[in-house]
Amino acid sequence: MKKQIISLGALAVASSLFTWDNKADAIVTKDYSKESRVNENSKYGTLISDWYLKGRLTSLESQFINALDILETYHYGEKEYKDAKDKLMTRILGEDQYLLERKKVQYEEYKKLYQKYKEENPTSKGLKLKTFDQYTIEDLTMREYNELTESLKSAVKDFEKDVEKIENQHHDLKPFTDEMEEKATSRVDDLANKAYSVYFAFVRDTQHKTEALELKAKVDLVLGDEDKPHRISNERIEKEMIKDLESIIEDFFIETGLNKPGNITSYDSSKHHYKNHSEGFEALVKETREAVANADESWKTKTVKKYGESETKSPVVKEENKVEDPQSPKFDNQQEVKTTAGKAEETTQPVAQPLVKIPQGTITGEIVKGPEYPTMENKTLQGEIVQGPDFPTMEQSGPSLSDNYTQPTTPNPILEGLEGSSSKLEIKPQGTESTLKGIQGESSDIEVKPQATETTEASQYGPRPQFNKTPKYVKYRDAGTGIREYNDGTFGYEARPRFNKPSETNAYNVTTNQDGTVSYGARPTQNKASETNAYNVTTHANGQVSYGARPTQKKPSETNAYNVTTHANGQVSYGARPTYNKPSETNAYNVTTHGNGQVSYGARPTYKKPSKTNAYNVTTHANGQVSYGARPTQNKPSETNAYNVTTHANGQVSYGARPTQNKPSETNAYNVTTHGNGQVSYGARPTYNKPSKTNAYNVTTHADGTATYGPRVTK
């Protein structure tokens, strides 16, 4: 527990040194390129197309982030997990550096092309050279992508196997069930609330205010951030938290010289909130102070940790030439952590040892210019810190990860009392390591410095920073993978849609169906003309697809201006085109329009081409005729549907007469007669005793349903 709290600054470094958007300072490290599992020859394979590359890079980026998130899990901070975490981190850094090297090569080529362009176009001002962090990888082969993906997957699986072995050997690291975790959390919260009761009782007391503020700060460090508290997920974490909280309470009473009561009432916000339940709050303060006043010294023989005897309380020696960690809170006077009473005094009382020990002579050195191309490993904090170049890291669409350590997330509130005997309290924001201030005059700040407890390479992984962008919304969602990218650079995942979810087509024309299967539409054609296939599906120039109308069903027949009639059953019949006394004319497709408006169709020009069957099983014969085969049935038996259409085992289709089912001939409302053999004959359209009528195109419909065409109207 404590080893994680005091090394937050060190743990942040590994997260901030990510390849694709590296604007942070880097630490000089070893070369991880040999750790990559990508074959050297894979870069010579087939390149991923430009329109598909961005989505693959996004998917690959999310894999890196997920792997890092595993390392930042709170309960993996125990020393038993160190080797497994180092192994996984090495693989992550190896694959990350492979991408960095590829990007460096491509960027150098890009600069040469830009220089050549400027020489050929010296007056051009519109095109500017991109910096390295603005430049994105433009060439990646499918083999490289697949090998990177598989490498990260196998690394995570190996880590999970190592974790399982570790937890089998150390039973106190076995994860709690949900019920066990809830009970453990309740026990820890109860003890923390007792500490808060002591804090509220003495924070307005001028004599003991500094110790009360320090008590609150230590409790907050143990519990974690208010918006992301530490999970009590196993037995060891629970025991360490309870021990830490008990020792924090004991430290308060030893440093103040007060006696610890045998029982302290726990703070309950539903009863003791200083604003909403001020009477209950004052009653709790009074009860706690009275319990402390009436307590004896018997508690000193039952302390959680051993306290050494000393005649003088010596303050901690101030450190020189510290390099301030980006996660450490900033204070007015840079005071040391308060571990004893302010003044040295003669006493035989036990001296409280600091919960958070400040390392002597930690991070030192000077800031210098970094190398041209940095690597990514957090080698050690005991060395020279150099300024890294502007090569970008993984976070393409958001700020550098290191930026977040200068702006901590919203902390737990600290209750700051007003001067004198006033009972009003004010809640003010507090940093992760807590800024503890007096009210007026003298400063009693408490600075909790991070400490590097491990100096081996790639062994420190801190909690991932929380982005400070608001509001949070989904920037992009991939329907094929279910991955959501948020505006703050984080990612979310969901299961493939199945069953009651509708089909969904993403920007790449990939459709995820209800059953979770995926179908792929045509790739965008880019500047190709729109094309409609035999199924009335049109692929447009931008790659989008539109579908023709379904049968209208139960709608009345309708004839448009071109004499094309859509019947109630969805069928379409074509009337003669108005000829207006024009002679017969045959167009380029061998379709002849006669003088009476009738149309006859000749064979399509064959141009001596052989028969050809396209991907939709539509065959164009040598004489220009077209036959439509069914979709291949793949060795299925012959099958006849309700319309008497038989699909044979070889995929061919034969059409029988429409079944008449021994019904007599029948004429419908449109004067269309279906005979007993299934044939259909068409009578004249019913006129309903209407007189002859001539429309705007000089076409006259007579009482018997026939039509005559007059000359075109000349204007």
From Swiss-Prot:
The organism of origin for this protein: Staphylococcus aureus
Polar residues compositional bias, start-end: 431-443
SUPFAM superfamilies in the cross-refs: Staphylocoagulase
Region of interest: Disordered: 306-348, 430-470, 674-697
One Gene Ontology MF term: peptidase activator activity
Biased composition (Basic and acidic residues): 306-327
Pfam families listed in its UniProt record: Coagulase, Staphylcoagulse
Its biological purpose: Staphylocoagulase is an extracellular protein which specifically forms a complex with human prothrombin. This complex named staphylothrombin can clot fibrinogen without any proteolytic cleavage of prothrombin.
Ranges for region 8 X 27 AA tandem repeats of A-R-P-[RT]-[FQY]-[NK]-K-[PA]-S-[EK]-T-N-A-Y-N-V-T-T-[NH]-[QAG]-[DN]-G-[TQ]-[VA]-[ST]-Y-G: 495-710
First and last residues of every Sequence repeat: 495-521, 522-548, 549-575, 576-602, 603-629, 630-656, 657-683, 684-710
Source superkingdom: Bacteria
Source taxonomy: Bacteria, Bacillati, Bacillota, Bacilli, Bacillales
Name of the protein described by the UniProt record: Staphylocoagulase
